[in-house]
Amino acid sequence: MNTQRAKDISESAAMAYVTYEGVPIYIQHVNEDKETARIFPIGNPQFEQEVLLSDLQEHF
């Protein structure tokens, strides 16, 4: 996923269907310099992690 799209999703009030390793996730924050995102699985905020943006997949 590109940086701008990830930022748009993280700042939007609408939920986008994005997955990490096949698991639906919520994007909390995007780090443009490192090209990473802080994410957690939907419904499991205790499993927060930082991942590469390139590992995120948006589904339409």
UniProtKB/Swiss-Prot annotation:
Q: According to the UniProt entry, where is the signal peptide?
A: none
- What is one process in the GO biological process aspect for this record? asexual sporulation
Major localisation? other
Tell me the compartments it is located in. Answer: Spore core
Quote the Pfam families the UniProt record gives. SspH (PF08141)
Top-rank taxon: Bacteria
Give induction info: Expressed only in the forespore compartment of sporulating cells.
What the entry lists under InterPro entries is as follows: SASP_SspH
Family listed: Belongs to the SspH family.
| Name of protein | Small, acid-soluble spore protein H
Question: Which organism is this protein's natural source?
Answer: Bacillus velezensis (strain DSM 23117 / BGSC 10A6 / LMG 26770 / FZB42)
Taxonomically, what lineage is the organism? Answer: Bacteria, Bacillati, Bacillota, Bacilli, Bacillales
Q: Which gene encodes it?
A: sspH
